[in-house]
């Protein structure tokens, strides 16, 4: 009897040990989604478009060159891909005055067009728009065809150079004379309003934009920072209050998640346009709806890249 009890005790101990041993995890439990790189093995027809069927105007780019000679390579890439003209936006993060941005591109004439920033230095001191308008006129005389890229992600136009426009939203009354001057000079305004909607949502397992959202998450807790809807209100105010001025909302107005709403705004405001730059992934989530939207509003939609200057990018 003792032998049986000893044997049973030993067996139970062995089973217990087996249960506590950690089993090796399979690849589905250890592979990070960020590292997942599936290779498509489906034998289906594929189309690679290497050159645009019709000449293309890229309405949203920046001064990406590190040296003047890089402009030559950029033009070669444009020629190879059928890009007739590129519009270069000026922002605070460019780091150079407007006239210095233009200089390296001069030999290519109309292959490049330039948009200027706004100087808010005086406006933020005493509310006057005089110096801002004078700078706008100066840039226009030098060749600026528009204003932008402005950028308001909640705290005002922080893309402006040389003075960032903290607290200056696009519907600020102090800017109204500037928008009137833009209309007079036929200079449209390109503005980056907010960020993609899912960046404002909880960064958890339900967020379908989590990989980017976790990195670029919008901190709306900053002082006087407007949220997504608050920013959309400022943009609509500007459209309504300045009907003679053209406003271009870049990146689909960051409204890819609600194309019916975006379309309704285009229907309501004839002075509103959008560009499609830097939102390929967001548009790809709803390919059929996006296609229908682009066809319906093709006269109000501008092509743009905002993503470098290589042929591969185009």
Show where each model-derived region lies:
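Sec-dependent signal peptide recognition
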Residues: 2-8
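C-terminal motif of bacterial Sec signal peptides marking the signal peptidase cleavage site
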Residues: 14-17
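An N-terminally biased module of ancient metal coordination in phosphate/nucleic-acid-related enzymes
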Residues: 20-107
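Active-site gating/metal-coordination segments in enzymes
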Residues: 27-31, 44-49, 99-217, 270, ...
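Hydrophobic faces of well-ordered beta-strands that scaffold small-molecule active sites
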Residues: 56-61, 85-89, 112-117, 147-149, ...
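Acidic/histidine-rich helix-loop elements
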Residues: 58, 62-69, 123, 161-163, ...
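Acidic-and-aromatic substrate-binding clefts and catalytic sites of carbohydrate-active enzymes
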Residues: 63-71, 89-98, 121-130, 169, ...
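H/E-rich (His + Asp/Glu) clusters that bind or coordinate divalent metals
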Residues: 67-68, 75, 223, 229-237, ...
């Amino acid at each position: 009897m003792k032998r049986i009890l000893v044997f049973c005790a030993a067996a139970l101990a062995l089973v217990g040990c087996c249960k506590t041993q950690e089993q090796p995890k399979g690849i589905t439990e250890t592979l990070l989604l960020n590292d997942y790189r599936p290779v498509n093995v489906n034998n289906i027809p594929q189309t690679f478009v290497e050159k645009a069927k019709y000449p293309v105007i890229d309405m949203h780019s920046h001064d990406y060159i590190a040296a003047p000679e890089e402009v030559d390579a950029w033009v070669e890439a444009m020629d190879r891909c059928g890009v007739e003209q590129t519009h270069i936006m000026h922002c605070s993060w460019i780091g150079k005055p407007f006239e210095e941005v233009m200089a390296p591109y001069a030999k290519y004439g109309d292959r490049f067009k330039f948009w200027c920033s706004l100087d808010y230095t005086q406006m933020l001191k005493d509310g006057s728009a005089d110096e801002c308008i004078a700078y706008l006129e100066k840039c226009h005389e030098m060749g600026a065809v528009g204003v932008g890229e402005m950028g308001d992600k909640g705290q005002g136009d922080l893309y402006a150079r040389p003075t960032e426009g903290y607290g200056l939203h696009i519907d600020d009354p102090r800017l109204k004379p500037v928008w009137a001057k833009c209309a007079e000079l036929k200079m449209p305004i390109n503005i980056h309003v907010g960020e993609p909607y899912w960046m404002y949502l909880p960064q958890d397992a339900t967020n379908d934009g989590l990989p980017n959202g976790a990195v670029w998450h919008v901190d709306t807790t900053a002082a006087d920072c407007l949220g997504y809807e608050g920013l959309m209100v400022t943009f609509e105010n500007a459209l309504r209050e300045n009907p003679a001025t053209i406003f271009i909302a870049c990146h689909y107005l960051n409204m890819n998640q609600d194309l019916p709403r975006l379309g309704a705004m285009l229907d309501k405001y004839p002075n509103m346009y959008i560009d499609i730059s830097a939102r390929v992934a967001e548009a790809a989530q709803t390919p059929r709806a996006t296609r229908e939207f682009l066809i319906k509003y093709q006269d109000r939609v501008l092509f743009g890249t905002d993503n470098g200057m290589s042929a591969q990018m185009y």
